[in-house]
């Protein structure tokens, strides 16, 4: 099983340019041919691209240095050397590229069509053809190729999830994500079972609309300061559109728990408190008393919209998904439904036209 690695430092070296050639024409009946040394080829670039099948940076643990191919040297007859082959490195979507020495953010992969030339190959050296002059008809020197660029990089992965599940340890985050997506996280009845984020895809409206959801390891008071599993995973909810605050319904003080969680998010990144959210009470199956559940909800309804569920028994999961549709994706779903309706309308019109054509042909025949 691959380990979840979301940060790693690597070194990349673009290819050196090829050397220019020192060469002279050698032809029959031409005793003193002029210079015809070709230029060296450009060194290969180091290019980074996203890969949708990657979810972790673990492949960069065993190898930390990467070098592109050098340009080939020039040859005679003014032929340039071949360009060095580019080196392509793949990273998960959501990876940010930092200069490890300056701390500057160089690139942020947010779509799968992007690519980033992080280090450019050196230019090839000029062949001796370029150095012929009135005072030097037979130059016996050429330029060496330039060195390729070098970069010391930090790759930092921030999951591109649409929804983040935040809660205390053992609130049932992994169980919930396993029930509403195809993800299969480790599930157990003890705190900190989840040691790394889990990502799943939720399919809605007959699979015409999808969104991604991530659960991160349980947050305890002081997480933003490094306590517990600390802030190492909080960055994975920085890009989310909405947050589910998930609680064990048997908690003694859900209001205080919510305040603590939101305070930790605020300490880490105040912007997170501006995201729309839902409050989810999990494990309502531990008592078979709807009135008791209603009583708990009545005490916290002033904090936000509350949905009571049992992830384990799959109780009210559709109700939760509908609430997420409304709170986080209402405009997007409306656009998708409108587009689908228009496509169906066009398809029906085409069928009518084809039917009219067939009927017309039958009448003529």
From Swiss-Prot:
Pfam families the record matches: GTP1_OBG, MMR_HSR1
A single cellular component GO annotation: cytoplasm
Subcellular compartments: Cytoplasm
UniProtKB keywords: Cytoplasm, GTP-binding, Hydrolase, Magnesium, Metal-binding, Nucleotide-binding
OBG-type G domain location: 161-329
Function: An essential GTPase which binds GTP, GDP and possibly (p)ppGpp with moderate affinity, with high nucleotide exchange rates and a fairly low GTP hydrolysis rate. Plays a role in control of the cell cycle, stress response, ribosome biogenesis and in those bacteria that undergo differentiation, in morphogenesis control.
Family the UniProt entry places it in: Belongs to the TRAFAC class OBG-HflX-like GTPase superfamily. OBG GTPase family.
InterPro entries the UniProt entry points to: G_OBG, GTP-bd, GTP-bd_Obg/CgtA, GTP1-OBG_CS, GTP1_OBG_dom, GTP1_OBG_dom_sf, OBG_GTPase, P-loop_NTPase
EC category name: hydrolase
Domain Obg: 2-160
Identification of the protein by name: GTPase Obg
Cofactor(s) the record lists: Mg(2+)
GO molecular function, one term: GTPase activity
Principal location listed in the UniProt entry: cytoplasm
Subunit structure: Monomer.
Keyword Disulfide bond applies: no
Catalytic activity, EC: 3.6.5.-
Gene Ontology biological process terms in this record: ribosome biogenesis
Binding site for Mg(2+): 174, 194
Binding residues for GTP: 167-174, 192-196, 215-218, 282-285, 310-312
């Amino acid at each position: 099983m691959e380990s979840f690695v979301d940060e790693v430092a690597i070194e990349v070296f673009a290819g050196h340019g090829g050397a220019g050639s020192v060469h002279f024409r050698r032809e029959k009946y031409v005793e003193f041919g002029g210079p015809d040394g070709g230029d060296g080829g450009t060194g290969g670039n180091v290019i980074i691209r996203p890969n949708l099948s990657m979810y972790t940076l673990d492949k960069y643990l065993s190898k930390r240095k990467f070098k592109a191919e050098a340009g080939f040297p020039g040859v005679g007859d003014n032929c340039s050397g071949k360009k060095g082959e580019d080196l392509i490195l793949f990273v998960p979507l959501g990876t940010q590229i930092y200069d490890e020495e300056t701390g500057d953010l160089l690139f942020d992969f947010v779509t799968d069509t992007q690519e980033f030339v992080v280090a450019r190959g050196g230019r090839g050296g000029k062949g001796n053809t370029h150095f012929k002059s009135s005072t030097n008809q037979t130059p016996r020197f050429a330029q060496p190729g330039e060195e390729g660029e070098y970069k010391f990089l930090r790759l930092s992965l921030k999951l591109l999830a649409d929804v983040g599940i935040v809660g205390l340890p053992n609130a049932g985050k992994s169980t919930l994500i396993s029930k509403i997506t195809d993800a299969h996280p480790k599930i157990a009845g003890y705190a900190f079972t989840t040691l790394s984020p889990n990502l799943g895809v939720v399919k809605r409206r007959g699979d015409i609309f999808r969104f991604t959801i991530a659960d991160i390891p349980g947050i305890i008071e002081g997480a933003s300061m490094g306590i517990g599993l600390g802030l190492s995973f909080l960055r994975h909810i920085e890009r989310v559109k909405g947050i589910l605050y998930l609680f064990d319904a048997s908690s003694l003080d859900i209001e205080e728990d919510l305040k603590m969680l939101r305070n930790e998010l605020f300490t880490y990144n105040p912007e997170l408190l501006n995201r729309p959210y839902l409050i989810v009470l999990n494990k309502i199956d531990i008592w078979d008393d709807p009135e008791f559940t209603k009583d708990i909800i009545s005490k916290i309804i002033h904090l936000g919209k509350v949905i009571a569920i049992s992830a384990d028994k799959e109780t009210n999961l559709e109700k939760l998904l509908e609430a997420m549709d409304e709170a986080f994706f209402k405009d997007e779903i409306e656009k998708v439904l409108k587009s689908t309706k228009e496509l169906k309308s066009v398809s029906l019109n085409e069928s009518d036209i084809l039917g009219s054509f067939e009927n017309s042909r039958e009448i003529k025949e």
